[in-house]
């Protein structure tokens, strides 16, 4: 059960960091049908 909690914390932390970097600077990846 602890493994599930640690995995959730790890994924949530990576998600927050990813979104922080993604929204801080404009995405350089070519988006299909993006805004």
Swiss-Prot record:
Origin superkingdom: Eukaryota
BP term (GO), one: photosynthesis
Q: What is its main location?
A: plastid
Q: What membrane topology is annotated for this entry? A: Single-pass membrane protein
Give the UniProt subcellular location, in the record's own words. Plastid, Chloroplast thylakoid membrane
Under InterPro entries, the record lists:
PSII_PsbT, PSII_PsbT_sf
Enumerate the UniProt keywords alphabetically: Chloroplast, Membrane, Photosynthesis, Photosystem II, Plastid, Thylakoid, Transmembrane, Transmembrane helix
Q: Name one GO cellular component term.
A: chloroplast thylakoid membrane
Q: Which Pfam families match?
A: PsbT
Q: Which residues cross the membrane?
A: 3-23
| Subunit architecture | PSII is composed of 1 copy each of membrane proteins PsbA, PsbB, PsbC, PsbD, PsbE, PsbF, PsbH, PsbI, PsbJ, PsbK, PsbL, PsbM, PsbT, PsbY, PsbZ, Psb30/Ycf12, at least 3 peripheral proteins of the oxygen-evolving complex and a large number of cofactors. It forms dimeric complexes.
Q: What does this protein do?
A: Found at the monomer-monomer interface of the photosystem II (PS II) dimer, plays a role in assembly and dimerization of PSII. PSII is a light-driven water plastoquinone oxidoreductase, using light energy to abstract electrons from H(2)O, generating a proton gradient subsequently used for ATP formation.
Alphabetical list of HAMAP family matching this protein = PSII_PsbT
Question: Which family, according to the similarity comment?
Answer: Belongs to the PsbT family.
The molecule here is called Photosystem II reaction center protein T
Protein's organism: Pinus thunbergii
